[in-house]
Amino acid sequence: MDAIILCAGKGTRLYPITESRPKPMIPIAGKPILEHIIEKIENYVEKIYLVVGFEKEKIIEYFKENPKIEYILQEKQLGTGHAVLTAKNFIKDDFLVLNGDIIFEDSIDEILVYENAVALSKVGHPENFGVVELGYDNKIINLLEKPKKEELPSNLINAGIYKLQNNVFDILENLVPSERGEIELTDALKKLIENGKLHGIELNGYWNDIGHPWDVLSANNRFLNKIISKVSGKIENNVSITGNVIIEEGAVIKPNSVIEGPVIIKSGSIVGPLAYIRPNTVLMENTFVGNSSEIKGSIILENTKIPHLSYVGDSIIGANCNFGCNTITANLRFDDKPVMVNIKGKPVKSVRKLGAIIGDNVKTGIQVSFMPGVKIGSNSLIGANCLIDNDIEQNSFVYKKDELVITKKRN
């Protein structure tokens, strides 16, 4: 049996983090979403076909040492069904299909029992997903895409993990494109349902569809809480380390710093002196958190520098960023209500605590503050003394035009 993982999309709801990387390459607990998926399935399959598109080179480079992986280019993103069809000439038997933006804990053993099966998950807001109605013997009798609340047949949703027979390719080839002009895998599933040939198996463990920035942080928290301590880096004098902490070889923790796990600090990173790294934080390779800076519940991507007197909370900071002194990310509203985030032009409720989502190659001057939930596009410059309370597009230069008045001092 082989597997197909769908990795070609752009992940626009996760901008600006996905402006310069495929969504499956966003790190969760220090490694890409896609690596978590591959680890869950590689013992079941002979070959793993990654259907790639946007920023494909980053996926190919990262997994180049894995002999099971081959790549199929989806030049135009014409739907999930079209993505599966690109693998038709490579698949000779039953196969797995997985969305490249999910993360889960359960084994897939149970779905392998059936000829055609879909993994299901219970969620709190099923109206945002494809919702499934189960009948006798786990047969799926209905699949509704994002139904209204009053039309919900259950709280079980399509979890984006499938085991299918090879003849599904024939169904896909004969589908009529959707209103969006796309070939949808769910339309093929509906054909199987009509013929009584699709089963649903509920996942009992954690599952998350990584659709928004706060989903990244939530999954990161979950998987960080499973780590086992391993300290291989250099720990200097008067450093306090509590909880489960991974400090890779080549990392340096300078004097009088405090680290409270779960935390991962990757190779080449420097922390301190006098830095405070709080729980649920990941510092990717070659990051620098300097004197009197505090990081809490955040993911700091590679080569980013937060040198001094700064606070980053519940945030995702892109690669190659450089924060000026006293850069602050606010992460909580006065009224304790969920932070509102602009997603594709619409305000969306997120979670109670959410800081800033900052793209790659962003630089800030001294005393820059970000209000909760703001997004800063890649390659932007934020000048000194700015309070950022709206999203900033990529390649922007933001500065404050205060007038400085100079007069002669009176005696």
UniProtKB/Swiss-Prot annotation:
Pfam families xref list: Hexapep (PF00132), NTP_transferase (PF00483)
GO biological process: UDP-N-acetylglucosamine biosynthetic process
Protein name stated in the entry: Bifunctional protein GlmU
Cross-referenced PANTHER family: N-ACETYLMURAMATE ALPHA-1-PHOSPHATE URIDYLYLTRANSFERASE, NUCLEOTIDYL TRANSFERASE
UniProt similarity note: In the N-terminal section; belongs to the N-acetylglucosamine-1-phosphate uridyltransferase family. In the C-terminal section; belongs to the transferase hexapeptide repeat family.
Protein function: Catalyzes the last two sequential reactions in the de novo biosynthetic pathway for UDP-N-acetyl-glucosamine (UDP-GlcNAc). Responsible for the acetylation of GlcN-1-P to GlcNAc-1-P, and for the uridyl transfer from UTP to GlcNAc-1-P, to produce UDP-GlcNAc and pyrophosphate.
Catalytic activity: N-acetyl-alpha-D-glucosamine 1-phosphate + UTP + H(+) = UDP-N-acetyl-alpha-D-glucosamine + diphosphate; alpha-D-glucosamine 1-phosphate + acetyl-CoA = N-acetyl-alpha-D-glucosamine 1-phosphate + CoA + H(+)
Residues engaged in binding N-acetyl-alpha-D-glucosamine 1-phosphate: 80, 130, 142, 158
Active site: 308
Region annotation Pyrophosphorylase: where it falls in the sequence: 1-204
Superkingdom: Archaea
Binding positions for acetyl-CoA per the UniProt entry: 384, 401
Keywords in alphabetical order: Acyltransferase, Multifunctional enzyme, Nucleotidyltransferase, Repeat, Transferase
Residues annotated as binding UTP: 6-9, 74, 79
